[in-house]
């Protein structure tokens, strides 16, 4: 199992020339992703410019709100606010309804009425579907799934373990 190459359609935080790229395939409704979020945020902050972080949607529960949360993040992305919305969605502890999603958008300064309209009309549904299909083609069947420089991270998502794996990847990249 390998992640697909990073494209301009991905949600990327960090420099392209960072020695380590960490890709997360995640789902805003997944309790394991919710639990992993603060660990990943801590790691992102700790490694700074040495780490490029990529988040890819895998809404898989079949619940309508599952896909709606991903669509809400895409609505925010279209306005340059993916990462603030990403954080807002994970702070909702995996429980989202239309009103919570609209409130999350408003909390980061987006227009609530525009968000509601985009979610009701499913403006970003096709984009989320395409991302989900791409994840399946990469062999992703569970969330969260992490890759460090293209290699699947197989350990528990705990800060000391993940940081150690990233440190090893930095050392390997340095030659």
What are the roles of these predicted feature ranges?
Residues 3-20:
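A short beta-strand-turn-helix
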Residues 25-26, 32-44, 103-175:
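C-terminal cap of thioredoxin/glutaredoxin-like
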């Amino acid at each position: 199992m390998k992640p697909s190459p990073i494209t301009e359609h991905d949600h990327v935080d960090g420099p392209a020339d960072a020695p380590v790229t960490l890709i997360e395939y995640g789902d805003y409704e997944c309790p394991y992703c919710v639990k992993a979020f603060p660990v990943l945020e801590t790691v992102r902050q700790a490694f700074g410019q040495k780490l490029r972080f990529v988040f890819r949607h895998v809404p898989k529960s079949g619940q309508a709100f599952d896909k709606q949360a991903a669509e809400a993040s895409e609505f925010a992305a279209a306005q340059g606010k993916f990462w603030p919305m990403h954080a807002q969605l994970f702070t909702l502890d995996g429980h989202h309804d239309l009103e919570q999603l609209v409130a999350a958008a408003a909390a980061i300064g987006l227009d609530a009425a525009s968000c509601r309209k985009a979610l009701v009309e499913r403006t970003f549904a096709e984009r989320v579907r395409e991302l989900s299909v791409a994840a399946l083609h990469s062999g992703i069947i569970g969330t969260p799934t992490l890759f460090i420089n293209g290699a699947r991270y197989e350990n528990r998502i705990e800060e000391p373990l993940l940081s150690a794996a990233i440190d090893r990847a930095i050392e390997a990249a340095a030659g």
